[in-house]
């Protein structure tokens, strides 16, 4: 790449165009960035998601546990999932369908090293999880037939 390569422009284009969901939420859990991948996976257009709580993609039965972890991360500045570790969890689409997503998070700090938000990169793995469940069920059925 030539000397006229603009890293900031590249990063912006990459974040917007990535096929995976890229979501940034501020310290209160309000969505501030939502890319085309997030729209494809979750169904909400950018204008529908920006300014909303992350609750729009978190199944209701998991919200208390999620927010406890989120608030702990905001308080301490540390997360168990910020070192490239991938977490698989259920998520919610706009139409109410539950999907399976894998994600990793990137904590964001200000100049004073205070947490200001978290970015997450998410991938829909619903099809893979369904195939794994079907294979496991087939294996159980095969073993029971023996």
Outline where the language-model segments fall.
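PAS-family sensory domains and close relatives that share small-molecule sensor folds
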Residues: 93-95, 104-110, 121
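PAS-associated C-terminal cap
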Residues: 1-8, 123-137, 142-146
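PAS/LOV-family and closely related PAS-like sensory domains
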Residues: 46, 58-101
């Amino acid at each position: 790449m030539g000397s006229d390569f603009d890293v900031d422009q590249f990063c912006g284009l990459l974040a917007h165009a990535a096929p995976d969901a890229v979501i940034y939420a501020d310290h209160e859990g309000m969505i501030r960035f939502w890319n085309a991948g997030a729209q494809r996976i979750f169904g909400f257009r950018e204008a529908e998601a920006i300014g909303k709580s992350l609750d729009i993609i978190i199944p209701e039965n998991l919200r208390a546990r999620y927010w406890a972890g989120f608030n702990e991360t905001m308080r301490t500045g540390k997360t168990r999932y910020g070192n490239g570790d991938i977490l698989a969890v259920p998520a919610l689409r706009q139409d109410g369908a539950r999907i399976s997503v894998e994600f990793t998070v990137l904590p964001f700090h200000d100049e004073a090293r205070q947490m200001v938000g978290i970015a997450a990169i998410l991938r829909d793995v619903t099809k893979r999880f369904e195939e794994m469940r079907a294979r496991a069920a087939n294996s159980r059925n095969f073993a029971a037939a023996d």
